[in-house]
């Protein structure tokens, strides 16, 4: 029988000093012996996805204490990728994932907490907390801040839906007037919450549902809606039950590694492919699997991508649907229900509520449930009122979207595409693979061949695109932007957005060892592995080389002979200390980022730290 970890600091005469300090935080004799549960919050005024979280930790804490636990809250950092985008700030985004994971480990282990409720939301915060949870392997429940409402504005006498990406594209489009650009900017992000499309934040919050670590509705129920409060109340109560099950009943099924099993990871990736999630999710699932000591690799993702269809299409792949529409159609559970009926899921998995997949679907799938309260929850909709307050409105759709032939979520028979929303490509400069969000690629360019235009920084590529140096038919190659080479593996949302602004969204391809925002669409291929800074063959591409992309056959090929590539590699190696570094790039890299780069692996490994360099 495991004993409470917290007993280390609360029991025994030799812990008098620790108890004295606990008393100074408000604990009493009656609390020593209760489970200490960390409320891992991520409130910050820098990020719209986290600006409303200040009081939500207290909400969870009250429920923990009412259920017989002791709640202790702390915050992690949170970087807003949209605000950090397009300048040196983006170098810090992916490395912040490791800092978040480490900081959670540090706080929880230093104070011997017994369990956690993780209040996350945006791009690197959910993955960082997920990595920490699987590393620590103590009871945990995730409850995120929820999605932002979609923006809406009237253009050309028509009401259209908007998001962050629209503001970026129109702001750079010389054909768009200043007044229209300003109108879109002011309308694109109307409320608190994670940006309203199927971008990285919302993708990851959906995947925590599929992994079983959060409650139904977590990924899609709007941040502003009053119904979302119940998820926080439930999390506080339920975590005490899970904690007591493990420590008092020796029930290891309450632990995250037993909930987020390999079968659950396969289900999460299947969901990701079916909903056309962000390519960043691949990076984060690979990293989380390593923390869980699960053998889940690019090969597994490749196999799944070849058999899973696309059943949901959401911004940025279409402007018709945003997360509020996914929720109306049944949310994550609605998509999982269609995947289950197609025989594409592992059914022998459980979630933090203790429900198996069939039980979860029976209770929460809008196509199956007889529970009017569940149906009412999925009718929770937007209010269209600018606010930074959680739970500030209670508007509802008149009806659910249960049209599986033409609605937001489709059945297998009416899939948007027989091929899923993500694909792994392999070739002679991506020997370990690269990722493309096929959900955002127009059918006309699924096969594409063109000459390379090579840039050794995102900044140079942006300057060339906006300066008219990139033309229709080109393949833009941005290298030395991987985890090690950047360092930090910057997102390339500005280059892809500016290609659209210049009318080249369906006329060019972009390939990088960096990564893309969840807001990216178009023929954008990232995570090329090995990266250039690690001796990857992407570092051998020269201007004018022909590159052939074949998404249907999962191929990507540099049309240069093996002999020529060998000669180029020899010349690169001969540069000595300058080998596999950019030739003409001035970039200030801090000590913190250099430390990150010294241990970073390529994207096919999840861009995690290379444990072999630490002797582990």
UniProtKB/Swiss-Prot annotation:
pH dependence: Optimum pH is 7.8-7.9.
EC code: 4.2.1.9
Catalytic activity entry: (2R)-2,3-dihydroxy-3-methylbutanoate = 3-methyl-2-oxobutanoate + H2O; (2R,3R)-2,3-dihydroxy-3-methylpentanoate = (S)-3-methyl-2-oxopentanoate + H2O
A GO BP entry: isoleucine biosynthetic process
Comment on bound cofactor: Binds 1 [2Fe-2S] cluster per subunit. This cluster acts as a Lewis acid cofactor.
Residue positions binding Mg(2+): 81, 123-124, 491
GO MF terms, alphabetically ordered: 2 iron, 2 sulfur cluster binding; 4 iron, 4 sulfur cluster binding; dihydroxy-acid dehydratase activity; hydro-lyase activity; iron-sulfur cluster binding; magnesium ion binding
This protein's GO CC annotations: cytosol
Keyword Nucleotide-binding attributed: no
Cofactors: [2Fe-2S] cluster; Mg(2+)
Pathway: Amino-acid biosynthesis; L-isoleucine biosynthesis; L-isoleucine from 2-oxobutanoate: step 3/4; Amino-acid biosynthesis; L-valine biosynthesis; L-valine from pyruvate: step 3/4
Residue sites binding [2Fe-2S] cluster per the record: 122, 195
Keyword tRNA-binding among record annotations: no
Classification via Pfam families: ILV_EDD_C (PF24877), ILVD_EDD_N (PF00920)
UniProt superkingdom: Bacteria
Active site: 517 (proton acceptor)
Stated role: Functions in the biosynthesis of branched-chain amino acids. Catalyzes the dehydration of (2R,3R)-2,3-dihydroxy-3-methylpentanoate (2,3-dihydroxy-3-methylvalerate) into 2-oxo-3-methylpentanoate (2-oxo-3-methylvalerate) and of (2R)-2,3-dihydroxy-3-methylbutanoate (2,3-dihydroxyisovalerate) into 2-oxo-3-methylbutanoate (2-oxoisovalerate), the penultimate precursor to L-isoleucine and L-valine, respectively.
Family affiliation: Belongs to the IlvD/Edd family.
Protein name: Dihydroxy-acid dehydratase
Gene label: ilvD
């Amino acid at each position: 029988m495991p004993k409470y970890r917290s007993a280390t600091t609360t029991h025994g005469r030799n812990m008098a000093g620790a108890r004295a300090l606990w008393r100074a935080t408000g604990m009493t004799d009656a609390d020593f012996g209760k489970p200490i549960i960390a409320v891992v919050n991520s409130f910050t005024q820098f990020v719209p996805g986290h600006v409303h979280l200040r009081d939500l930790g207290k909400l969870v804490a009250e429920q923990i204490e009412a259920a017989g636990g002791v709640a202790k809250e702390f915050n992690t950092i949170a970087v807003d990728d949209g605000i950090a985008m397009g300048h040196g700030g983006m170098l810090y985004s992916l490395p912040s994932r490791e800092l978040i994971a480490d900081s959670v480990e540090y706080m929880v282990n230093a104070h011997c907490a017994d369990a956690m409720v993780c209040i996350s939301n945006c791009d690197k915060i959910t993955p960082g907390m997920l990595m920490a949870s699987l590393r620590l392997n103590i009871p945990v429940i995730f409850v995120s801040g929820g999605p932002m409402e979609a923006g809406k504005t009237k253009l050309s006498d028509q009401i259209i839906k908007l998001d962050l990406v629209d503001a970026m594209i129109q702001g750079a489009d010389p054909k768009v007037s200043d007044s229209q650009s300003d109108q879109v900017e002011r309308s694109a992000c109307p409320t608190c919450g994670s940006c309203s499309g199927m971008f990285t934040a919302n993708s990851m919050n959906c995947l925590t549902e599929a992994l079983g670590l959060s409650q139904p509705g977590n990924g899609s129920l709007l941040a502003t809606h009053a119904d979302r409060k119940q998820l926080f109340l439930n999390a506080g109560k339920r975590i005490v039950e899970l904690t007591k099950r493990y420590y008092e009943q020796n029930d290891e099924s309450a632990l995250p590694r037993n909930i987020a099993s390999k079968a659950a990871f396969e289900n999460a990736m299947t969901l990701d492919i079916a909903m056309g999630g962000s390519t960043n999710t691949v990076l984060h699932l690979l990293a989380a699997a390593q923390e869980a000591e699960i053998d889940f690799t690019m090969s597994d993702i490749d196999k799944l991508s070849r058999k899973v269809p696309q059943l949901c299409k959401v911004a940025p792949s279409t402007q018709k649907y945003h997360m509020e529409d996914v929720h109306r159609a049944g949310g994550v559970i609605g998509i999982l229900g269609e995947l289950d009926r197609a025989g594409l899921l592992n059914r022998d998995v459980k979630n933090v509520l203790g429900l198996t997949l069939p039980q979860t679907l029976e209770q929460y799938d809008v196509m199956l449930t007889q529970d009017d309260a569940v149906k009412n929850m999925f009718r929770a909709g937007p209010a269209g009122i600018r606010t930074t307050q959680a739970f500030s409105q209670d508007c509802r759709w008149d009806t659910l979207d249960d049209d599986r032939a033409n609605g937001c979520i489709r059945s297998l028979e009416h899939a948007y595409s027989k091929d899923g929303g993500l694909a792994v490509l392999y070739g002679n400069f991506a020997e370990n693979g690269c990722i493309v969000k096929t959900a955002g690629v127009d059918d006309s360019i699924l096969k594409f061949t063109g000459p390379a235009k090579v840039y050794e920084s995102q900044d140079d590529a942006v300057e060339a695109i906006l300066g008219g140096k990139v033309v229709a038919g080109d393949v833009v190659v941005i290298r030395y932007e991987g985890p090690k080479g950047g360092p930090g593996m910057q997102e390339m949302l500005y280059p892809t957005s500016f290609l659209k602004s210049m009318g080249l969204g369906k006329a060019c391809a972009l390939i990088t060892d960096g990564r893309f925002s969840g807001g990216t669409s178009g023929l954008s291929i990232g995570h090329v592995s090995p990266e250039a800074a690690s001796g990857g063959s992407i570092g051998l591409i020269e201007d004018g080389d022909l590159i052939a992309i074949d998404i249907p056959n999962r191929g990507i090929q540099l049309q240069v002979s093996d002999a020529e590539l060998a000669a180029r590699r020899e010349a690169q190696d001969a540069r000595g200390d300058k080998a596999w570094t950019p030739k003409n790039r001035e970039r200030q890299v801090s000590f913190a980022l250099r430390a990150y780069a010294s241990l970073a692996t390529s994207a096919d490994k999840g861009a995690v730290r290379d444990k072999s360099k630490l002797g582990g």
